[in-house]
Every structure is written in structure tokens, then in C-alpha cells.
């Protein structure tokens, strides 16, 4: 953009290198090194001894031309020595082995021996000389400390940061010549003294710092040199011209026109590029302007500055704006139409690209085009379009209206079908409330072009019956986004309004939406080329309806098209201020940025380490830190707030970005150019063009990107790919540990390749864009579809040799995906490719669609709906609260005015849009029995999808697990108002057995619909969890092998899942890390979760709170295995089937409620797999048997006990009950629970650790298969027990356990018992049958199946199986076997007809038994106590002992099974030892 100065040779062209070696005594260099910083000189060469003499060594030139005496020494083996003392220079030379490389230059008028002279010269920032000056200062500060006359600031240490001296002392130093450079900055004197010839004994050896500068933290040096480099030098001067040495030529990039040696030698200065600029306004840098132009000084309060790449820009401190245009040349600049052929207007650049041909860059307005701007201007002038548009603009503005009847023009109606490329037209406008949205361009071959009814300039009036006059640009784009591919949209347009012209008001905002192409943000400096007629500034609606700004077109077909060039690169964002949330991570040295005071608050002054504050930009104003408003805090208070966070803490930062920026000379890096800032344009005005950001786009940052990058960014617009997916390119640089991710898949020709685990602290995690379960499409441009796993690894190995890789991955997206706000404004990473702008796609709620719904409930019921609240802050105008479920038969259902997905904007006339979750709950509670909701109808779909219908069930099935029901204690998004707000659950839960029996079958049918993948993305919500110390905190049930879907089985208390608050027991898992779960196995689901590393992304469909049992799907298949990565600690032992919240409102007796619960539970368990075992709060003890054949009569429900006060008593005594929802509402054995909680649950089982893994399963009795299957037993040999094992493969392997393994486990169980764990005991019936109870501690052996006889009236909802003995059994005398008898085993005859029954364990009684060594004296008491409890429970359940038939005896084939050592068998007496 700038004119080239008169080019002369730079001193760099005279630099020469040679390799020399010494011959002589060790330490004798054979050459004389003179000068040094202590003398104010560069190091330079003296006499070279090329002949032996005087006892010294000789200098032998190995290669290159021998240097001459007096040559300035710049480098030794690539290490800069300028600014070092003579002593340190010699130390550096002696450090290297011979031969050594010397880089020297002949002294001239710029570089000579005088160090002070060189430091006093003014050089363009980013130039070689400027960098060399910084190298000199850094080397000086190894031995000297700058001095200043200002007072010390907070944290500064005198003698370390500065020597703080008086003005008189400073003057004395200056007059004595002791200062190498001096000047003033901010009214204070600064100077750099000469270093001492000999360092003090306390100073470290600087050689290592000089040699390995990149390994040392130079930030402190940078802070110290900032003021020195910014100061106004008292002796500053311009480099003198000489015949063989010339000034630098500015060509727009800050590089010098030199010989070939330039590129070879300039890299050595790159490592110390400073992070600050010249800012003093008196430094006009006149030496870089053409002398013959005789330009006058800059206008008042104007300043010229340079980008990091050397481009000149100008700062107008009057308006706090920046511009590329030199205000002094504005008057001399020609209008484009006045330029000659071959001449370009000022500020334009012509780019010759080998792939895309010739195009033009307007550096003033930050835009590109293919047409020559001179030819374009002349054509416009001939047609007179500029005047026409200018005249019509005022008319257009004056006639804006929101009333369609007042529009002037012809109404046009069109119906367009959305294709994979969108609707085929671009829109512009809508940046202000009084601006029309108009069609800017109709794309060739698109749906709009094929329809033929839409033309450029048409005003969009109506979309699908919704008037959009006055709507914002973003509003309309979102409406188009919500239209699925292949669906039609009806448009009403008005023809008769011209498009706005370039010559409009220069301060108008151009496009107020971040351009997005296929979900990826297209920011300033990026280019998207296409073969279509894309026009600048237009919003292209792609297949997802996202808007993408195309920054170049390949041809311009007419006057109207060519005039549509006003939207520019810089207009990718609004000039209006915007609030952005940035996630910070506190590193070992802080958050990686510095702040300073500003009129609007604490401003980000400098980015010190971007890895901890990715997305943060210089100039951002801090508004909130971790949701705490800090706008009114002082600088020190904000610093203290930041200091209080520990290392590693994630701290969200709310910042204000955009708007009028404060004056700055900071040459923004490429990262800074990615911020969303507006561009203010002018064409015809003769005043300088203001821009709210410092321009930094040169040839490399303008549309001339790498051709492959341009192609990859643009090809996705029309690429044939599945809907609801997006492709992105991720460029990674290899670290020592590799690229930081694993690859899955490729096992077959049709299997895709997926990204596996993201390695912590690896390259992929630091980059932040790659996700587990992303489908890998290409590696360095090579498609991997159909390739084997090994071939993919070979490609990655090749990429690793190159040190970098470009990955193309495909990611599935879905409605309502909650994306972190921080990524919507992520800056470029160090790899140079942008992060995704994964903006949320909310449904817009038009105010005219709102209506009121009044709900009135009875005293004994709730309102019957569930509210979902978005955790992340929604976009402006989007209501974050919506209906998540409507309970069947509830007031919400009866009124007919609420449906799933409707948004709630107000409660009783009070707006809740900005209210917190808890406040909304309280507001509804305070409403009493009547509440009025202001509802905004859902726009995404009409009526709930089939998956959501599963939520509409009887209130009897709607109870939530304890710990999740009380709305004001839920830690997440969802509050359940179905029964929690003033609800009396008694009437809701009073159902007869027959009523409940009829409910079970429809329940199963509805859940079957949930299992099918019907429109999965609708009605679902995404949840992303981070692994906690003990896992994700949930467990699954189901899978393809069980002929059912995947469901949430339980939530661990205090685990990540329950803390998130959106996950509930019974929710169906639709996707795991982007992969659909339809048809996948249980094992595959676990692998997907494990592949995600520390994070997992789940797509969930709301459930009913009940878990569909595998018996309801396939009674011959097991279905549950533990994927509970975080075992939950127990709640209070007095838990009940209904939630705590609901029980607090039960006015009826507990007996009535408990009887209903018993009936419910019995029916729920009726059709389940036969092998249900007793559960101890999800940690089922294993019954130590190898092979026992159990049969179950599905006709006869099992017996059970009631749940009145006696049931609660049993809970208090540690008797564990099993709840269907497997949530934290089960009582537990305290001792065993504490034991389990201390053991982390592994994700995969090592074969060597299988026994230990089993011990960790919360329901081992259910998870273990039979060890031996006997023919003729009535059991299906292929049938597996239901289990919830932490190992995905455990179910298939348990059946093969050998006897030796069992013995080992038994011995281990025995050793654990010796350590003091509660003991197991066996209750042996008179006929040889045993009744076994197991401590939760002993989890080492699989439990066999069981014969169960059911009776409906005796099924308990709390106890899985408590098979009580008959009168005959209970009256039999028995005794408790002592410890010494534990090793005894039963005979085959004793066990041949045995039916093992369970009784629950009382932790208190177990502990008492463990303490009492003599069990014989207590046997009768224990037996009597249990019998009494049993009888009372039976009475409570409404049955008598006479009604309890004897257990049906199934023939058992004798087998070589062993009784665990914990179980005491007493010979042949037939007496049962009860476990107490």
C-alpha cells in the first residue's frame, strides 16, 4: 500500500561469515577481540595471528573469507554478542568447540564500533535494525540495570528492576558519558548505563542466558525495556545515507530489499522480537517517508505507527480510531475514476495468485475483489449509478416501515426448497431496527435462481407467515437455520427498494453477524473462494442455514453486482460492543495476561502467555470474574480477585469487546485481527478513514491465504455430506509426545475412522478443537474412508516425521446443542487455524406469539410440568426456560395450553427471563394453587416427538429418585414441578394392584418407542460431563445384545452427572460423543465413553424416572452392567420409593403409602429376569457359590414383606432395599459402603484384576453369571444374569470361571474376614437347604441364579428378595457357628434339593456378632428377633404367616460347589444359622 522508497544497499548485504579454528595453547584464541559494551562499543576484531610467534596461537580460516581487523563481530556460532562486555564475548567464544563460525560486518555509517550511536538511531519497528537494538539491550541488561528518575511502583525492586535515582544524579551520569542511551518517557528520565568491565561476584554467569535465550523467561526483561524503548531519546537521529549503505525500503511488509543473504541471516534476530512498540507522538519516523515529497507534519493528535509486519498505519487520537490512509496524502490521492490505465488508487494492491488469478486488495476498507477498481469506478461513472444510489438512499431511509401495507413496491411471493447449499441467495441489512433486510445476490443454480421469482434488492417481508420487518439480521438468519434440508419456506418480498450503495454514511454498520460457513467462523483475514457468484458482505445461507460471508467473487456480471462491494473483511462483526465469555485456566505463573486501568474498567493490557487465556485479546474490558461483577473494583482489588484462584482453576471471564477502542499503537498480531470489530468506511469523503482496530492485514493476511486453506474452507459449502454434520480442519504441530490423540476404528472396509481419547496436555488438547468421536475424513489431504487402521497409522507416522498434520474431521451437530460461549470468539491458536464458532441455535420467540396459560391445582397435586433452564447464557432475545415435560392427567396436561418445548417468559406477570433457576421455583411455590404462565409457542416442531411422549405417563410412574426431586436443590438445569410444589403424593400414589398392573404394559410399550431412533435429535438435549475424581458418576443399562436402548441406570451422589443436574435416571442415551447409540452394544457404549478421555458428550432424551427392565424387552437377555464411573455414597437409610420432597407432603399414614409402593414394586419386578438379587445400594455382595440351579415361576410373584414402620426400622438397622431408579435413595450397610467408596472404579478390567473388579460392582449378585449350567435344570444355557459390572466384558467371561478361581476367591474372602470385616452366615433349613446372607465386603464370587416364587400381595418395593422361611422353617432350632467351624462344607446330599433364600444384612447386628466370639449364646435371641421382625412385616403387608406358602422346591442337580468360608454349615443337624 505504501510507496517504495529509494532503495539502497543495507548493511546486512555486507555481512560475511567464516569458520575459524585456533592452533596454539588452550584458551588462546589466535585473534584479538576488542571493544565491548563497557567501552560503549560493539565487539570487533583486532589483529588476527595467522603466523606463529610470540608464543601465541594462530588463527586458521577453515571456510569463508577471512575477516578484516576492525570488522564488527555480530554473532558467534549463531549467538548474538552485540551488547556484551569484552569479557563475556570471550567467554562465549571459548564455550564452543573449534572451528567456530563468526559473523562480521564491515563498519559503516549505521553500524560501526560506536554502540551509543547505533542505539540512538530510529528504525522501523519490525526491521532488522530494530530487532538488533532489542538484542543489544537484552545483552546489556545481563550486566547493567537501567536507571530512572521516577518513583518505584508496586512490586518493583530497586537494584533489580531499576536503579531509582534523582534527576541530579541522572544529569551527572549523562554528562559523564556513563549512559549508553537516555531519554524521557511519561515525564521521567530513563537511561541505560554502561556495564562494568568485570561483573560483581554476586552476578550469575550470563553465558548460558546468552546461549540459550529461548529457554529463559525474558518477560521481566521486556517489562524493564519497555519504557527505555518507548522513551523520547534526547540524541535520536536518522541513519545517515552513504554510497554503499542505504536506508531501509518500506514495501508494505517491513522487509528490506536485500540480496539473497538477507533471508539467510535475518532469522537470528527473530527470537527476540519485542512485544511492545514505539508510542511517543513526537517520533514521526520521517526517515521512512519519501524525502522528495516534502510532506508536512502530521495533523494535530495524529500519529504514525507500524504493525508487527512493518505496515504503516495512522492513529487519530481525536476520534480514537486508526486508518491505513496517510492524512497528509489524502488531498493528493486520486479518485479511482481519475487514475490512468495500469495505475491503482492509493491504498490498493494487486495480487497475482497462481491458483486464483489476479485480484485486488483495498487496504483502506479491508476488502478484496476481482475487478480492477479503476475499471469498476469508470464503469460506474459512465452508468451514473453512484449518483442514483446516493439519491435513493435517503428515500429508502425515510420510508422504512414495519407495516407491510405501507411498503412501496410490488409484493412477490416465493416458495423455496432448502437444498444442501441453502436457499441460494444472500441477504444484507438488518443492522439497525430501522433497516430493511434485502436480498443482496441470487446465487447461480441455487433454489432461488431456479425459482426465478427473487431478485437482488427485494426486501424480505414475511417468512412462513411471520413478519420480519424490523427484525435483526441474526433473527432472520436463525429463522432460515431452523428450516431442515429439503423443506420448503414461504417468502413474501417487496420489490422496489434499491440496495444501499458504498457512498452511504461511513459510520453505518455493515453486517452485524459473525459470518459462519458450515458452523466455522470466517474471520478477518480469511478468504473463501468459490466458483459461484459470491459477493462481498453478503450472508450465504449454507445447508444448515448458517450465514457465511464470502470475501471474494470470481466475476462481476453487471452494474448492480459490481456496486455491491461495500461489506468488507473488517465488517465481519458489529462495531457495537459485545459481551464475550472467555474461559481462563490459571497456570503456574498466573492467567497469562496483564491488566491496566481504563475509563471503562480494567482493560487487558498485554497477553503474556496465551495458552492460559485463549480467546482473550488486548483491549478487552473485564466485566465479571467467575460471575462476580468487578466493574466497580479498583485495579488492586481485581488483581486480588484473580490471585485468590488456585493453580489449575477454570475461571470464566466476562469481557466487553468492540466499540470505540482506546488509542493504541499496539501492532496487533494476526490473532488480534480475528476479533469481531466493525469497519467504518468512506469513499468520497476527503478525510482519513477511521477504523476501530489497528490494521494488520498485509499480503499474507489478506485474501492471499495458502491456496489449500482457501479451498478447504470453501469446499464444504457444496460438498455432499450427511445433514446435521459439519467438517472442520485442524492443524496440529507435533510435540514430543506426539499429536496428542488416539485413533479408533478401521477394523473393516465399511467402518469409519474416529478420533479416540484426547491425551491430556497433548497437542490436540492444547489446540482445543479436536473432539473424541469426531469422524476422521482426511489426513494431510488424503481421504481415509475405507482405509484400515494400520493404513491410517502409517499416514499419521508420515505426518509425525514432517512435524505437523492437517486433519479434516466431521462432527455431528444437532438441535439445541449447547456450545461454550468462549469458543464463539476464540482467537487463533498457535497452530494458525481458527477454532469453531459453535454458536447455539436457539428458537426465536416472537413477542406476538406469547399467550397466557392459567393452571389451577388441587391441594393434593402438583401443577404437572417440568421446566428446563439453559445453563449457558442464551443470546439476546432468547428465553432460556422451556417446558421439558408435561405429566399426564395433571393440571398442565388438562389445560391443553402447554406442550413440551414451549418457552416460559413470565410467571404471574413477572418476567423470568433473567431469573435464576431457584428464583423461578420459589416464584411458582409462592403462587399457591393457581399460577399464570406466559408461554411462547415452540417453533422447532409442532407437538412433542415420540421420544418426548414417553414422559407423558401416569403420576404413579413419575416419581424421581431422592436427591433429585427437590427443585430448589437441583444443581443443574431441570426442575421438576410435577409433584414437588405443594403436592400431596398420597392420592397420586394410591392405586390398587389391578390398576398398577394395567399400567405396566403400556409403560413398556412407550419405552419401546423410546428405544427406536425416531427423529433422535428432536426433543433431546446434550450434556457434556467432565470426569471427576472417581468417574462421570452414572451407570447405564441396555444395549443391542439385550434388544433394548441405552438408559441411565443410576446417578452417583456428588458425581459429575448429578452435579450437572440435567441427567436423570431413566433418560435414554441417544448419542455418545456424537455416535448414535441405535444398534450399538453395551460394550461399544462403554468404549465410546472411555474413548472420550476426561470428557463425554451425551445426547439424552428425557425419560420417566423409571428404568425399562430388560425383562420387559427380552426376558432371556441380561441388560445392565455398571458403567458407573463414580460410585455414589449412600443417602440416609430411611429412604423410600417416593422422593424425600414428596414424602414431606404425605398426610396419610405410612402404611397406605407403603402398601401402594409394595404393589408398584412388585409389578415393576414382575416380568424381569429371573436372576434378580438383593441389592445393597448398588453394591451387591456376591454369594459364594459355583453352580446352583434356580428356577423362577413367572406366574407366582415372590413373597415379600410390608413397609410400614417395621420396614423403616429395618432401614435404620442397615437393611438395604432396592429401588428401581437406582438413585441415591437406597439405604445401605454403612461399613461396607464406606469400604466400597474408597475403591476407585476402573473403566476396563485387566484380566489379572478381574476378581478385584468384580468386588467393586455395586450389584454383583446381578452381574455374575452362573459358573456351571446343568442340563435339565430348566434354565436357558445361553442366558446371562443381569449385571452392572464396571467391566464391559465381564458378563461374557464369568460363566467360564474355574473351580480354582473360585477357591482363590474364597480364600481371599476368608482372609478379608480375618481382618475384621463383617461375616457372612448361612441359614440352613432342616431339609438341608441353606439361607445365605452376605456382607457387602465380600464381593469376590459370582452369585448363582435363584428360584423365586412370586405372590403379588407379598412383593416389597424396597427389598429385592427377602424370602422368609415358613413356620416350619422359622420354628426350627438353630445355632450360630463359631469362627472355627467356618471351613466346613456341606455334602452333596445336603445341597441337592436346596433353595437358597436371601435375607438382608443388618450392619449393626453384624458388628455385634463380630465382636461376640461366642455365638451359641446369642443364636436364639437373633433368631427370635428376626422372626419377630418378619412377622410384623408380614402383618404390615396385609398377609399372615398362614398365607405364606412353603417355598416351592425345585430339583437341584448336585454339583461340586463350595460354600464360602463366611457361611457356616453345621453338619447334618438341619438347623439354619441366621445372618444378623
Swiss-Prot record:
The record lists the membrane-crossing segments as none
The record's subcellular locations are:
Cell membrane; Cell junction, Tight junction; Nucleus
- PDZ domain residues are 18-108, 413-495, 581-657, 729-811, 852-939, 1022-1104
Q: Which GO terms describe its cellular component?
A: bicellular tight junction; cell-cell junction; nucleus; plasma membrane
- Compositionally biased region (Pro residues): 193-204
Binding residue positions for ATP: 123-130
| Domain WW intervals | 296-329, 342-375
Q: Does the keyword Lipoprotein apply?
A: no
Q: Region entry Interaction with PTEN: which residue ranges?
A: 413-495
Q: Does the keyword Ribosomal protein apply?
A: no
Residue ranges, annotated region (Interaction with ADGRB1): 729-811
Lipid bilayer topology? Peripheral membrane protein
Phosphoserine (modified residue): where?
236, 598, 702, 833, 916, 1321
Name the segments for region: Interaction with ADRB1 and TGFA: 18-108
Q: Which stretches of sequence are listed as region Interaction with LPAR2 and GRIN2B?
A: 852-939
Question: Which UniProt keywords are present, listed alphabetically?
Answer: ATP-binding, Cell junction, Cell membrane, Membrane, Nucleotide-binding, Nucleus, Phosphoprotein, Repeat, Tight junction
> Which residue ranges does the record assign to the Guanylate kinase-like domain?
116-290
| Basic and acidic residues: bias regions | 1193-1211, 1230-1265, 1317-1340, 1350-1361, 1419-1437
Q: Provide the GO MF annotations for this entry.
A: ATP binding; frizzled binding
Which InterPro entries does the annotation name?
Answer: GK/Ca_channel_bsu (IPR008145), Guanylate_kin-like_dom (IPR008144), Guanylate_kinase_CS (IPR020590), P-loop_NTPase (IPR027417), PDZ (IPR001478), PDZ_sf (IPR036034), WW_dom (IPR001202), WW_dom_sf (IPR036020)
Family, per entry: Belongs to the MAGUK family.
The UniProt function text for this chain reads:
Acts as a scaffolding protein at cell-cell junctions, thereby regulating various cellular and signaling processes. Cooperates with PTEN to modulate the kinase activity of AKT1. Its interaction with PTPRB and tyrosine phosphorylated proteins suggests that it may link receptor tyrosine phosphatase with its substrates at the plasma membrane. In polarized epithelial cells, involved in efficient trafficking of TGFA to the cell surface. Regulates the ability of LPAR2 to activate ERK and RhoA pathways. Regulates the JNK signaling cascade via its interaction with FZD4 and VANGL2.
**Name of the protein:** Membrane-associated guanylate kinase, WW and PDZ domain-containing protein 3
Amino acid at each position: 500500500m505504501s510507496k517504495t522508497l529509494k532503495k539502497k544497499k543495507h548493511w546486512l548485504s555486507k555481512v560475511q561469515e567464516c569458520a575459524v579454528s585456533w592452533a596454539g595453547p588452550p584458551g588462546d584464541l589466535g585473534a584479538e577481540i576488542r571493544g565491548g559494551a563497557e567501552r560503549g562499543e560493539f565487539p570487533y576484531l583486532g589483529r588476527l595471528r595467522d603466523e606463529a610467534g610470540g608464543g601465541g596461537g594462530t588463527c586458521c580460516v577453515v571456510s569463508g573469507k577471512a575477516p578484516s581487523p576492525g570488522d564488527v563481530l555480530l554473532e558467534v556460532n549463531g549467538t548474538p554478542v552485540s551488547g556484551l562486555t569484552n569479557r563475556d564475548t570471550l567467554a562465549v567464544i571459548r564455550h564452543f568447540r573449534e572451528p567456530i563460525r563468526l559473523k562480521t560486518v564491515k563498519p559503516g555509517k549505521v553500524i560501526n564500533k560506536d554502540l551509543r550511536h547505533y542505539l540512538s538511531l530510529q528504525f522501523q519497528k519490525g526491521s532488522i535494525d530494530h530487532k538488533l537494538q532489542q538484542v543489544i539491550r537484552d545483552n546489556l541488561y545481563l550486566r547493567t540495570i537501567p536507571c530512572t528518575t521516577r518513583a518505584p511502583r508496586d512490586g518493583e525492586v530497586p537494584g533489580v528492576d531499576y536503579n531509582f535515582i534523582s534527576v541530579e544524579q541522572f544529569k551527572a551520569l549523562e554528562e559523564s558519558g556513563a549512559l549508553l542511551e537516555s531519554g524521557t518517557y511519561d515525564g521521567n528520565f530513563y537511561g541505560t548505563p554502561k556495564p562494568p568491565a568485570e561483573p560483581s561476584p554476586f552476578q550469575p554467569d550470563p553465558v548460558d542466558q546468552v546461549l540459550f535465550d529461548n529457554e529463559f523467561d525474558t518477560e521481566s526483561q521486556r517489562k524493564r525495556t519497555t519504557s527505555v524503548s518507548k522513551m523520547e531519546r534526547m540524541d535520536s537521529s536518522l541513519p545517515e545515507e552513504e554510497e554503499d549503505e542505504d536506508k531501509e525500503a518500506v514495501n508494505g511488509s517491513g522487509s528490506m530489499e536485500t540480496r539473497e543473504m538477507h533471508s539467510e541471516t535475518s532469522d537470528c534476530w527473530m527470537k527476540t522480537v519485542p512485544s511492545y512498540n514505539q508510542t511517543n507522538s513526537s517520533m514521526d519516523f520521517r526517515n521512512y517517508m519519501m524525502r522528495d515529497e516534502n510532506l508536512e507534519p502530521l495533523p494535530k493528535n495524529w500519529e504514525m505507527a507500524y504493525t508487527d509486519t512493518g505496515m504503516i498505519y495512522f492513529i487519530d487520537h481525536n476520534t480514537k480510531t486508526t486508518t491505513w490512509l496517510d492524512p497528509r496524502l489524502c488531498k493528493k490521492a486520486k479518485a479511482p475514476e481519475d487514475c490512468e490505465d495500469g495505475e491503482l488508487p492509493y491504498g490498493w494492491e494487486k495480487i497475482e495468485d497462481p491458483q486464483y488469478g489476479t485480484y485486488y486488495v483495498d487496504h483502506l476498507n479491508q476488502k478484496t475483489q476481482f475487478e480492477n477498481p479503476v475499471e469498476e469506478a469508470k464503469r460506474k461513472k459512465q452508468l451514473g449509478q453512484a449518483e442514483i444510489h446516493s439519491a435513493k438512499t435517503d428515500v429508502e431511509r425515510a420510508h422504512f416501515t414495519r407495516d407491510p401495507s405501507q411498503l412501496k413496491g410490488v409484493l412477490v411471493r416465493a416458495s423455496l426448497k432448502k437444498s444442501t447449499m441453502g436457499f441460494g441467495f444472500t441477504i444484507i441489512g438488518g443492522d439497525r431496527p430501522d433497516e430493511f433486510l434485502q436480498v443482496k445476490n441470487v446465487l447461480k443454480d441455487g433454489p432461488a435462481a431456479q425459482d426465478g421469482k427473487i431478485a437482488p434488492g427485494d426486501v424480505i417481508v414475511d417468512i412462513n407467515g411471520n413478519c420480519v420487518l424490523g427484525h435483526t439480521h441474526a433473527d432472520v438468519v436463525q429463522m432460515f437455520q431452523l428450516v431442515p434440508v429439503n423443506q420448503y419456506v414461504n417468502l413474501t418480498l417487496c420489490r422496489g427498494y434499491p440496495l444501499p450503495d458504498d457512498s452511504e454514511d461511513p459510520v453505518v454498520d455493515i453486517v452485524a453477524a459473525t459470518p459462519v460457513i458450515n458452523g466455522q467462523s470466517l474471520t478477518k483475514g480469511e478468504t473463501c473462494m468459490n466458483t459461484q457468484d459470491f459477493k462481498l458482505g453478503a450472508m450465504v445461507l449454507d445447508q444448515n442455514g448458517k450465514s457465511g460471508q464470502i470475501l471474494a467473487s470470481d466475476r462481476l456480471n453487471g452494474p448492480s453486482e459490481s456496486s455491491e462491494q461495500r461489506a468488507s473483511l473488517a465488517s465481519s462483526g458489529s462495531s457495537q460492543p459485545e459481551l464475550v465469555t472467555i474461559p481462563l485456566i490459571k497456570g503456574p505463573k498466573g492467567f497469562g495476561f496483564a491488566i491496566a486501568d481504563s475509563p471503562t474498567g480494567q482493560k487487558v493490557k498485554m497477553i503474556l502467555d496465551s495458552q492460559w487465556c485463549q480467546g482473550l485479546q488486548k483491549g478487552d474490558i473485564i466485566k465479571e470474574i467467575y460471575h462476580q461483577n468487578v466493574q466497580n473494583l479498583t485495579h488492586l482489588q481485581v488483581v486480588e480477585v484473580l490471585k485468590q484462584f488456585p493453580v489449575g482453576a477454570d475461571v470464566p471471564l466476562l469481557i466487553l469487546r468492540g466499540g470505540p477502542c482506546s488509542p493504541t499503537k499496539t501492532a496487533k498480531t494476526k490473532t488480534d485481527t480475528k476479533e469481531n470489530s466493525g469497519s467504518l468506511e468512506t469513499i468520497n469523503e476527503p478525510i482519513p478513514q477511521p477504523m476501530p482496530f489497528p490494521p494488520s492485514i498485509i499480503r499474507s493476511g489478506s485474501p492471499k491465504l495458502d491456496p489449500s486453506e482457501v479451498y478447504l474452507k470453501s469446499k464444504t459449502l457444496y460438498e455432499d455430506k450427511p445433514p446435521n454434520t459439519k467438517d472442520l480442519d485442524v492443524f496440529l504441530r507435533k510435540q514430543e509426545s506426539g499429536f496428542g490423540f488416539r485413533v479408533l476404528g478401521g477394523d473393516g472396509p465399511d467402518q469409519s475412522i474416529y478420533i479416540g481419547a484426547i491425551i491430556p496436555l497433548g497437542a490436540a488438547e492444547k489446540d482445543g478443537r479436536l473432539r473424541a468421536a469426531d469422524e476422521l475424513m482426511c489426513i494431510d489431504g488424503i481421504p481415509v474412508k475405507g482405509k484400515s487402521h494400520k493404513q491410517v497409522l502409517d499416514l499419521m507416522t508420515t505426518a509425525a516425521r514432517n512435524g505437523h498434520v492437517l486433519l479434516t474431521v466431521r462432527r455431528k451437530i444437532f438441535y439445541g446443542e449447547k456450545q461454550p460461549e468462549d469458543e464463539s470468539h476464540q482467537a487463533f491458536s498457535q497452530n494458525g487455524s481458527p477454532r469453531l464458532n459453535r454458536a447455539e441455535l436457539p428458537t426465536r420467540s416472537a413477542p406476538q406469539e406469547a399467550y397466557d396459560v392459567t393452571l389451577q391445582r388441587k391441594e393434593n397435586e402438583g401443577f404437572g410440568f417440568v421446566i428446563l433452564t439453559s445453563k449457558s447464557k442464551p443470546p439476546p432475545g432468547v428465553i432460556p426456560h422451556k417446558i421439558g415435560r408435561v405429566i399426564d392427567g395433571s393440571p398442565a396436561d388438562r389445560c391443553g395450553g402447554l406442550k413440551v418445548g414451549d418457552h416460559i417468559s413470565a410467571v404471574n406477570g413477572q418476567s423470568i427471563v433473567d431469573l435464576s433457576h431457584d428464583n423461578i421455583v420459589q416464584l411458582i411455590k409462592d403462587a399457591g394453587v393457581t399460577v399464570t404462565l406466559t408461554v411462547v409457542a415452540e417453533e422447532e416442531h409442532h407437538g412433542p416427538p415420540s421420544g418426548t411422549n414417553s414422559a407423558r405417563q401416569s403420576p404413579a410412574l413419575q416419581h424421581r429418585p431422592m436427591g433429585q426431586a427437590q427443585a430448589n436443590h437441583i444443581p443443574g438445569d431441570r426442575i421438576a414441578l410435577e409433584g414437588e410444589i405443594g403436592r400431596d403424593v398420597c392420592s397420586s400414589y394410591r392405586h390398587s394392584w389391578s390398576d398398577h398392573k394395567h399400567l405396566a404394559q403400556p409403560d413398556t410399550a412407550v419405552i419401546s418407542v423410546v428405544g427406536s431412533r425416531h427423529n433422535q435429535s428432536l426433543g433431546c438435549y446434550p450434556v457434556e460431563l467432565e470426569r471427576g475424581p472417581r468417574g462421570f458418576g452414572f451407570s447405564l443399562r441396555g444395549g443391542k445384545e439385550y434388544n433394548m436402548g441405552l438408559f441411565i441406570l443410576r446417578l452417583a451422589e456428588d458425581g459429575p452427572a448429578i452435579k450437572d443436574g440435567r441427567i436423570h435416571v431413566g433418560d435414554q442415551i441417544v448419542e455418545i460423543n456424537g455416535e448414535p447409540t441405535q444398534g450399538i452394544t453395551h460394550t461399544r457404549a462403554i468404549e465410546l465413553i472411555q474413548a472420550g478421555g476426561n470428557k463425554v458428550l451425551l445426547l439424552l432424551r428425557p425419560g420417566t424416572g423409571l428404568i425399562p427392565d430388560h425383562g420387559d424387552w427380552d426376558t432371556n437377555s441380561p441388560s445392565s452392567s455398571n458403567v458407573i464411573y463414580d460410585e455414589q455414597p449412600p443417602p440416609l437409610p430411611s429412604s423410600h420409593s417416593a422422593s424425600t420432597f414428596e414424602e414431606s407432603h404425605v398426610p396419610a399414614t405410612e402404611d397406605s403409602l407403603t402398601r401402594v409402593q409394595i404393589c408398584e414394586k412388585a409389578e415393576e419386578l414382575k416380568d424381569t429376569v429371573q436372576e434378580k438379587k438383593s441389592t445393597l445400594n448398588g453394591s451387591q455382595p456376591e454369594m459364594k457359590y459355583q453352580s446352583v440351579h434356580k428356577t423362577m415361576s413367572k406366574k407366582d410373584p415372590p413373597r415379600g414383606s410390608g413397609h410400614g414402620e417395621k420396614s423403616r426400622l429395618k432401614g435404620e438397622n442397615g437393611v438395604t432395599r432396592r429401588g428401581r431408579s437406582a438413585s441415591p435413595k437406597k439405604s445401605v450397610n454403612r461399613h461396607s459402603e464406606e469400604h466400597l467408596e474408597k475403591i476407585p472404579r476402573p473403566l476396563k478390567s485387566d484380566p489379572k484384576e478381574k476378581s478385584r473388579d468384580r468386588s467393586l460392582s455395586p450389584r454383583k449378585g446381578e452381574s455374575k453369571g452362573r459358573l456351571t449350567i446343568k442340563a435339565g435344570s430348566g434354565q436357558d444355557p445361553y442366558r446371562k444374569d443381569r449385571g452392572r459390572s464396571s467391566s464391559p466384558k465381564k458378563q461374557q467371561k464369568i460363566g467360564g470361571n474355574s473351580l480354582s478361581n473360585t477357591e482363590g476367591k474364597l480364600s481371599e474372602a476368608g482372609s478379608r474376614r480375618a481382618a475384621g470385616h463383617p461375616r457372612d452366615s448361612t441359614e440352613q433349613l432342616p431339609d438341608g437347604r441353606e439361607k445365605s446372607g452376605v456382607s457387602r465386603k465380600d464381593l469376590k464370587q459370582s452369585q448363582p441364579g435363584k428360584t423365586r416364587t412370586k405372590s403379588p400381595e407379598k412383593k416389597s418395593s424396597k427389598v429385592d428378595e427377602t424370602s422368609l422361611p415358613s413356620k416350619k422353617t422359622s420354628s426350627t432350632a438353630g445355632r450360630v457357628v463359631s469362627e472355627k467351624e467356618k471351613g466346613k462344607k456341606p455334602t452333596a446330599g445336603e445341597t441337592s434339593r436346596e433353595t437358597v433364600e436371601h435375607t438382608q444384612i443388618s450392619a449393626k447386628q453384624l458388628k455385634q456378632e463380630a465382636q461376640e466370639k461366642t455365638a451359641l449364646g446369642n443364636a436364639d435371641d437373633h433368631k427370635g428377633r428376626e422372626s419377630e421382625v418378619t412377622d410384623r412385616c408380614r402383618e404390615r403387608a396385609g398377609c399372615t404367616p398362614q398365607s405364606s406358602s412353603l417355598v416351592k422346591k425345585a430339583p437341584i442337580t448336585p454339583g461340586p460347589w463350595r460354600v464360602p468360608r463366611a457361611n457356616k454349615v453345621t453338619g447334618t443337624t438341619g438347623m439354619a444359622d441366621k445372618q444378623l
